[in-house]
Amino acid sequence: MTKNIGKITQIISAVVDVKFTNNSKLPAILNALECYSDNQRIVLEVVQHIGDDTVRCIAMDSTEGLVRGLEVVDTGSPICIPVGTATLGRIMNVVGESIDGKGEIKSSNVSSIYKPAPSFTNQSSERTILVTGIKVVDLLAPYTKGGKIGLFGGAGVGKTVLIMELINNVAKAHGGYTVFAGVGERTREGNDLYHEMIDSGVINLEEPEKSKVALVYGQMDEPPGARARVALSGLTIAESFRDMNEGQDVLFFVDNIFRFTQAGSEVSALLGRVPSAVGYQPTLATDMGALQERITSTKHGSITSVQAIYVPADDLTDPAPATSFAHLDATTVLSRQIAELGIYPAVDPLDSNSQVLDPMIVGEEHYSVARQVQQVLQTYKSLQDIIAILGMDELSEEDKLTVSRARKIQRFLSQPFHVAEVFTGVEGKFVDLADTIEGFKGLVEGQYDGLPEAAFYMVGTIDEAIEKARTLK
């Protein structure tokens, strides 16, 4: 078969125009084109047809070194990456090339990064709780197996640390495979995560096929084309694991979905599209839907997705985080006000929610305790203005008791993390769901009214709080 060959006619940042002449066929939209600069393979993706013989492409790598007149070959298909067990324990980039210095990823299976979402008839609607061992999450905004979970927060409130703890608690305890997509985040964090996974045994360097995780990185220093597609590459690997074995539950972590949107916005501007609200691409909802609708459970297995979502200027109404909300089963909102109190994880217990916090799914006791906890915290929140102006003395005895319990609940929602041991020097805790419910039930019923507030700060179970209270006296 004769190769379809074109030549570069224009390069503007990450946008490259390629002209195909001599009666050669124009490559289809989303086809991958290849060219070589200084023996380095550069992949271009077709996004527009201009006139009869030119295509406009987005580069998946730096365009440094590219020149007009350089030969470009049409691969005849979209970007394809290796999938299956050969990817375990390895790090690849958006086009499936290894970036861990351990040679090519050799797999008998390759797959296009573009696929339709599973049909309605193939999807599964079964709902079971995924226990994370993090009290505030398990009690107030529980996660569901095969669900989509969003971690919302501004800069520096702990999204990545929470994702790391979830990988630690869930991926290690969980028998299936995990895929981590690093989308436009810090390279240092990606490197730290890789080495932590080696230390903890999640990645086995001697026998990579025994590893439990595959990593796909398109970090901050990558061009927008790579950052806009790397989440799709990660999802393609997760889908291959889900469909490979019957009943396989795959964990898919994305850090950060906002960078996926941001990269789409950069690409859109480079292509000269008219921006929509706040400068985002006009296709924001379509791009988000194309990614999110593929993250789902089928009759073969499920993909449970945890996505960190940066909130620009702490504004949840910004179009990027707001578009994500519609697709999620549970939202965990991280609050700067709670972080300022020194309470970590800085999860907002009133803003966070979950579709599975339903007595039919979690049980009557869990639902009742969660709602009582939220009621106490909501009452405390409404009393804060009065306390700030008039002081605690002006409150009724009942309100004083509510405030006291709320402050204890607030502190008991904090918890030492395993991944933060190196910073805090405090051993991380995994708390079972039954212990979490028992502890908070006792708090709202007033069983621990006599214990000091400090006893509830940074402990695991209620027994640890009682033990800590003894040492404080």
Swiss-Prot record:
ATP binds at G153, G154, A155, G156, V157, G158, K159, T160. Gene3D superfamilies: 2.40.10.170, Bovine Mitochondrial F1-atpase, Atp Synthase Beta Chain, Chain D, domain 3, P-loop containing nucleotide triphosphate hydrolases. It is found in: Cell inner membrane. GO terms for cellular component: plasma membrane; proton-transporting ATP synthase complex. Pfam families: ATP-synt_ab, ATP-synt_ab_N, ATP-synt_VA_C. It catalyses: ATP + H2O + 4 H(+)(in) = ADP + phosphate + 5 H(+)(out). Its EC number is 7.1.2.2. It comes from the Bacteria. One of its GO terms (molecular function) is ATP binding. The keyword Coiled coil does not apply. Produces ATP from ADP in the presence of a proton gradient across the membrane. The catalytic sites are hosted primarily by the beta subunits. This is ATP synthase subunit beta. It comes from Rickettsia canadensis (strain McKiel). The lineage of its organism: Bacteria, Pseudomonadati, Pseudomonadota, Alphaproteobacteria, Rickettsiales.
